[in-house]
Amino acid sequence: MKYSTKLSDTVHVMVLIAINQENSLSSASIAESIHTNPGFVRQLMLKLKKAELMTSVAGHARPSLSKPADHITLLDIYKAVEGDKPLLHLDTHTNPDCGVGINIQLSLQEFYNEIQKTAEEKMNMITLQDIIDTYYQRTSIENNLQNII
């Protein structure tokens, strides 16, 4: 089973944009940070632009957030890159001749819907600024530890 890392990669992109507002930031340099290719980064950035979460001008390596980081939620970012795709997916290729196989989807769907609702509510409470603040706290702690050693 392959898991999507689009959300974490897109948050990575947005944090880089937010903390590098004064610096040039090309899709190639962002891709290097994520260990991916610039084309993938451009696809993510295009989705962010369509969702009106970031702005950029073609040919200029200066993307920017379209609104303050404390007004962008993790749910906004998730919806921008994943659309209405649910977090959990049912296996619809089960054996129709098996009692469990034929009924498991309906049995699980109610629980998956609850999980989706709860996750979206929590994601809507977490802002990009919260993530940036946590990033700065972690880098500060790491720098302090390196100074001690």
Predicted regions and their residues:
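Short alpha-helical segments that sit at the start of domains
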Residues: M1-V13
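Short helix-capping/hinge SLiMs at alpha-helix to coil transitions
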Residues: A18-E22, K67-P68
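Conserved segment of winged-helix/HTH DNA-binding domains
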Residues: A69-T94
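C-terminal regulatory/oligomerization modules of transcriptional regulators
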Residues: T92, P96-I149
